[in-house]
């Protein structure tokens, strides 16, 4: 018993030894296996012929097994080809080496034995892995040939340790012996894919298996060997914008024909070479890996476009333009090195020959009918999309930052606060409405120290050029601030309106019973210079005297009527220049917001002298009274004049301790609303104002209220007539030329009129005007000096010569003027119509829908909504000239890019057409795939047409195909 037990214990050891031996045998050709694992796969056509294929193949048995089998699962571990749920079979005996629960089971594929039709799992690349069931099946059953279910292009022979060619020569013709097997595999793959997707959704596991990872799925038509395999691309770090564009470029037939032609003999630059490798990895016979790593190509591209380095999110349309431009520039540089001239017919680059089209812009003048046509090349059409304007938001009250109140200034008790009124502009008069609604006037009388307050009726106000008039709100503001002192800035007059009651209460608190009148002893010509004035204040009340004010008003009117203009001119000549300049500037400001009658009276001359009468002020008026005549030769006055001018311009800071600078009062930073585009910062996470730098407006929706928005509608809007007017008016060359000729004619005519008028002034032009050349010829014949009759003729000849010389001078002068006029550029702006049409249709039409926009504030927004598009589109109605001999511009959809999310963060996915080359308009023979980075799944055409497309790729249908 013990010996038997020992023999049984040795059996697994032998099995392990055989496995190790098989492992060594499988690793004997490291060059081939290593190259395949790295993705640098040689073409299957270059492999050697297998001597076991004809002997071992049992085609009938394999076909019967495929037709009779219900599920495609591994016979050892019961792992499905699509589900991969990781369930163990009863006969697996719980071995960990072959269990599907192994994390490496996701890298397995189903292989079909070509001798018995058994399904076994193995490696995705090659079936000779050390822990694959297909290797164990071959070792146990001695079966040598297998084919991969997910990619029938892979046929493997275990004794030869190499891939089998797809086609085999038979009587000089290349045929695929396994074509029937491949057709059955393809039919079963599509059916199982649909049923597996339905089961996963019903069982609730759709979160994992709804995005079926078709690693190396067969998407090419084997009969048409120019198809390709849709394979995922590794996300290198927020590179979905790059992967979505590359999936569409890899699906274009024209690019594939160029890069795969003659095995890539025409090697280009580094960017084109790395792109050729990507196309090679998508060949059907090279589908040995599930996912392609585009790191080499992306690094080569970033060397030419460094703005895409890093891990930031970018726009896929921007990347497409930069990529095409880089490829075209690289090819042009190589052609220059090779000495290819630009005039050669083949000088167009690959990108221009595939994506290049041409538009014609026709502009017609609405005045003369002249039209101009300009041709512009394009690589893609950017079409604007109509959108719904967001409803206007309710106006929110603008919360302006309140002025920081300064601490009260300490003033000696014996000095009344009223004395600070002396810092106000000399002779300033404030008017305000009292509680009874009548106007309360403050008058400044230079003859008396007492102030008077009286209600006034509204009446005309006499103004002078040196009087500044402000509105009622400004007057009340200045009156309310008179108790705290004038801060030296006219900006204080701009502020909220203060009622008369509040002002009176504030003034009573300061010990002022009524508005105060300042007596000016010495007046300086500057609004902010403190004058030598005294203000009478105290407990005495100011009594109003309406009759006295009316009498003063009548005296003022009489004084104005009796003024003489000479006195006015003399008085103006004695004024200081700086003062007059400031007065003129202030008088212009006084016209703003004042009554028409007041504005007219402001143009009158200042009639006031030293003994001026009190001035009557109407409502809503603030007047700066005129100043005394002071000679500008005084140094102190000169300094004050300089201070006055600098105060107006804001270039001088007074040294007065009571001065408060409000120059930056309105320099508040503009705050923006809305979310921010870009990665959030720490300030944003904590709620700090990150919004102030960049923001994102609310997402907008496509306007489909009138008609459903479609690509055809966007093309119609792109090619419709546009009226150019106002600032966008067109510079019509024909109108400019006509105007130029008209001006030359007028100039020539005026020169002729001037020459005639000058000759007429000599008195003899009319007499000899008709004789002209005849008299000159006669004078030329009479050349005998002895003849006395010739004297008069010679004198007349001199006059004739002078006349001819002057005429020549005028003619040369006119010609010179014409030359000068011809050199002048005359531009005439005319209203015109503009229409853009497609003049040359490209082989691959790229349509970019403008879903991203930026407003005037710099806020970014995305336009959400579906834009309808068709699988087949006809551009004949958008062409400039109708197609006669060439193929009509009919296109078929090849792929698209979709963006989901917002401006802050989103994701790009690609929808591409897989399978055979498009030869017919029938879409039933092709399959569509949704590719999201490394994940690939098959979708229906209806789902593709309902996606929110951002970039569309259309391939032109040619009759010769």
Swiss-Prot record:
PROSITE patterns, per the entry: USP_1, USP_2, USP_3, ZF_UBP
Residue numbers binding Zn(2+) 1: 50, 52, 157, 160
SUPFAM superfamilies assigned to the protein according to its UniProt record, in alphabetical order: Cysteine proteinases (SSF54001), RING/U-box (SSF57850)
Residues that, per the record, bind Zn(2+) 2: 74, 77, 121, 133
Catalytic residues, chain numbering: 240 (nucleophile), 907 (proton acceptor)
Catalyzed reaction equations: Thiol-dependent hydrolysis of ester, thioester, amide, peptide and isopeptide bonds formed by the C-terminal Gly of ubiquitin (a 76-residue protein attached to proteins as an intracellular targeting signal)
Top EC class of this enzyme: hydrolase
Cited PANTHER family: UBIQUITIN CARBOXYL-TERMINAL HYDROLASE, UBIQUITIN CARBOXYL-TERMINAL HYDROLASE 2
Stated name of the protein: Ubiquitin carboxyl-terminal hydrolase 2
Organism of this sequence: Arabidopsis thaliana
Lineage, highest ranks first: Eukaryota, Viridiplantae, Streptophyta, Embryophyta, Tracheophyta
């Amino acid at each position: 018993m013990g010996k038997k037990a020992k023999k049984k214990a040795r059996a697994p050891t032998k099995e392990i030894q055989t496995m190790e031996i098989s492992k060594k045998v499988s690793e004997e050709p490291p060059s081939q296996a290593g190259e395949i694992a790295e993705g640098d796969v040689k073409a299957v056509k270059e492999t050697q012929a297998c001597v076991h294929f004809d002997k071992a193949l049992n085609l009938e048995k394999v076909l019967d097994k495929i037709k009779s089998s219900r599920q495609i699962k591994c016979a050892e571990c019961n792992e499905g080809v699509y589900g991969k749920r990781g369930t163990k079979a009863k006969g697996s005996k719980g071995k960990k080496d072959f269990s599907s629960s192994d994390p490496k089971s996701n890298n397995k594929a189903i292989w079909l034995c070509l001798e018995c039709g058994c399904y076994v799992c193995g490696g995705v690349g090659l079936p000779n892995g050390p822990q694959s069931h297909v290797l164990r099946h071959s070792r146990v059953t001695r079966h040598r040939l297998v084919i991969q279910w997910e990619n029938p292009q892979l046929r493997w022979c275990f004794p030869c340790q190499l891939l089998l060619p797809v086609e085999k020569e038979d009587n000089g013709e290349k045929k695929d012996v396994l074509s029937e097997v491949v057709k059955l595999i393809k039919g079963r793959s599509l059916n199982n894919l649909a049923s597996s997707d339905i089961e996963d959704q019903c069982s609730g596991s759709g979160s994992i298996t709804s995005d079926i990872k078709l690693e190396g799925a067969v998407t090419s038509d084997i009969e048409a060997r120019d198809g390709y395999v849709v394979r995922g691309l590794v996300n290198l770090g927020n590179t979905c914008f790059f992967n979505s564009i590359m999936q569409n470029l890899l699906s274009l037939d024209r690019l594939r024909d160029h890069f795969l032609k003659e095995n890539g003999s025409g090697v280009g630059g580094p960017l084109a070479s790395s792109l050729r490798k990507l196309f090679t990895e998508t060949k059907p016979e090279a589908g040995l890996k599930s996912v392609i790593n585009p790191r080499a190509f992306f690094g080569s591209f970033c060397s030419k476009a460094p703005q895409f380095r890093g891990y930031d999110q970018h726009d896929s349309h921007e990347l497409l333009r930069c990529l095409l431009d880089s490829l075209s520039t690289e090819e042009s540089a190589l052609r220059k090195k090779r000495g290819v001239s630009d005039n050669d017919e083949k000088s167009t680059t690959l990108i221009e020959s595939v994506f290049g089209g041409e538009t014609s812009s026709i502009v017609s003048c609405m005045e003369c009918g002249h039209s101009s046509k300009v041709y512009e090349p394009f690589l893609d059409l950017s079409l604007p999309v109509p959108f719904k304007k967001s409803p206007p938001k309710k106006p929110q009250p603008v919360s302006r930052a309140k002025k920081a109140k300064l601490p009260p200034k300490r003033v000696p008790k014996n000095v009344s606060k009223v004395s600070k009124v002396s810092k106000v502009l000399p002779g300033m008069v404030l008017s305000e409405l009292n509680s009874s609604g009548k106007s309360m006037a403050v008058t400044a009388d230079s003859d008396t120290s007492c102030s008077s307050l009286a209600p006034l009726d509204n009446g005309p106000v006499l103004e002078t050029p040196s009087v500044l008039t402000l509105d009622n709100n400004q007057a009340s503001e200045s009156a309310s601030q008179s108790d705290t002192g004038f801060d030296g800035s006219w900006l204080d007059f701009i502020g909220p309106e203060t009622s008369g009651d509040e002002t009176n209460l504030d003034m009573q608190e300061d010990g002022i019973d009524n508005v105060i009148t300042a007596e000016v002893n010495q007046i300086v010509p500057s609004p902010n210079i403190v004058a030598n004035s005294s203000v009478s204040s105290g407990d005495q009340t100011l009594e109003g005297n309406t009759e006295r004010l009316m009498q003063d008003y009548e005296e003022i009117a009489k004084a104005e009527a009796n003024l003489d203009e000479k006195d006015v001119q003399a008085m103006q000549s004695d004024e200081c220049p700086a003062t007059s300049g400031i007065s003129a500037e202030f008088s212009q400001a006084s016209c703003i917001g004042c009554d028409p009658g007041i504005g007219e009276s402001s143009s009158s001359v200042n009639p006031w002298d030293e003994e001026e009468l009190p001035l009557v002020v109407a409502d809503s008026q603030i007047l700066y009274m005129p100043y005394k005549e002071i000679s500008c030769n005084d140094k102190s006055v000169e300094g004050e004049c300089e201070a006055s001018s600098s105060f107006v311009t804001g270039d001088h800071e007074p040294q007065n301790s009571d001065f408060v600078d409000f120059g930056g009062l309105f320099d508040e930073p503009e705050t923006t609303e809305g979310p921010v585009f870009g990665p959030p910062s720490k300030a944003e996470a904590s709620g700090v104002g990150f919004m102030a730098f960049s923001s994102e407006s609310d997402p907008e929706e496509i306007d489909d209220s009138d008609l459903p928005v479609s690509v055809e509608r966007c093309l119609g809007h792109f090619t419709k007539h546009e009226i150019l007017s106002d600032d966008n008016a067109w510079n019509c060359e024909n109108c400019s030329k006509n105007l130029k000729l008209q001006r030359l004619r007028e100039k020539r005519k005026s020169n002729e009129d001037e020459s005639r008028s000058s000759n007429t002034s000599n008195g003899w032009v009319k007499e000899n005007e008709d004789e002209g050349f005849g008299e000159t010829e006669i004078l030329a014949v009479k050349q005998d000096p002895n003849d006395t009759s010739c004297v008069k003729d010679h004198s007349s000849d001199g006059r004739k010569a002078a006349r001819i010389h002057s005429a020549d001078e005028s003619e040369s002068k006119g010609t010179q003027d014409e030359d000068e006029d011809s050199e002048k550029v005359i531009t005439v702006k005319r209203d015109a119509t503009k229409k853009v049409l497609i003049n040359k249709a490209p082989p691959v039409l790229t349509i970019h829908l403008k879903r991203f926009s930026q407003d005037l504030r710099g806020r970014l927004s995305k336009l959400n909504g579906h834009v309808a598009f068709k699988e087949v589109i006809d551009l004949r109605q958008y062409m400039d000239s109708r197609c006669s001999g060439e193929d009509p511009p009919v296109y078929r959809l090849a792929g698209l890019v979709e963006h989901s999310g917002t401006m802050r963060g989103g994701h790009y996915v690609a929808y591409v057409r897989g399978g055979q080359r498009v030869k017919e308009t029938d879409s039933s023979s092709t399959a569509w795939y949704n590719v999201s980075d490394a994940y690939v799944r098959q979708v229906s055409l209806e789902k593709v047409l309902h996606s929110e497309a951002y970039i569309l790729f259309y391939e032109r249908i040619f009759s010769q195909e």
